[in-house]
Amino acid sequence: MPTDNLSSKDKMALKARAHQLHAVVLIGQHGLTPEVIAETNRNLDAHELIKVQVAGDDRAKRIAIAQELCAATHAELIQHIGKQLVLFRRKNTDE
């Protein structure tokens, strides 16, 4: 479910909400695995807005991981600061 319809005002509000959150998904030395994607999906289903911690010092690799993770989970990258990502995906209200 793409969330391209978020305005900059919405993104600012989500950033403010995310400020107090702790990372619930940790991506380690093995990078983006199917287990990490599944765990991210579970957390997005439960919380809508989550923080993800990405290990490693290579900035380009962290950006690539963020893009791949967003594509795999149909989430939107709200913020990327250092090794922290903030992802958002609206809850499915059809269920």
Please give the residue ranges for each predicted region.
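Positively charged, polar, low-complexity stretches
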Residues: 2-95
